[in-house]
A protein has these predicted regions:
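Generic structural signal for small/hydrophobic residues in well-ordered secondary structure
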Residues: 7-8, 45, 86, 105
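Active-site neighborhoods of divalent-metal-dependent phosphate/nucleic-acid chemistry enzymes
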Residues: 55-61, 65, 69-115
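Short, well-structured N-terminal submotif of metal-dependent ribonuclease cores
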Residues: 1-37, 51-66, 108, 117-121
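Alpha-helix capping/helix-boundary segments
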Residues: 9, 41-42, 82, 101, ...
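Short, structured coil segments at secondary-structure junctions
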Residues: 71, 122-123
Length: 128
């Protein structure tokens, strides 16, 4: 299975947070699955850190890169087809990062790993 972790899921995986469900944790750790982290999540983390809403033990760039590698996640660029698909989505979610992740999941045939119930309203596969 090809999975796309949202920002919250990535942070919880990196911190071994107990809020992460067993289903999500198992799917993300399974060697049978390819798990992606979007550049959108890296950008969201950097913005939240700069605004003082997300304390990190190191720079956002170093944190995201080192945790992504440690968790064996593949990087996923936010490309032109995903950007074009984003504007076709109904305005069901106010967070532009989450809308971008939905677009990426649809365009790339990925399942989104997220606790965000609002994402389930979109025509994307969700795992939690």
């Amino acid at each position: 299975m090809k999975l796309l972790v949202d920002t919250c899921t990535f942070l919880w995986l990196a911190a071994a947070d107990p809020q992460l469900t067993d289903t999500a944790r198992s799917a993300c750790r399974s060697p049978e699955n390819t798990v992606y982290l979007s550049a959108l999540s890296a950008w969201e983390i950097a913005i939240k850190h700069r605004l003082g809403r997300l304390p990190l033990p190191e720079t956002p760039a170093r944190y995201v890169s080192s945790r992504r590698e440690w968790l064996r996640l593949e990087p996923l660029a936010f490309d032109e087809p995903s950007a074009a698909h984003d504007v076709l989505l109904p305005p069901l979610h106010s967070d532009p990062f989450d809308r971008g992740l939905v677009a990426q999941a649809i365009v790339n045939g990925l399942t989104i790993v997220t606790p965000d119930e609002a994402i389930s309203a979109y025509p994307a596969r969700v795992l939690w």
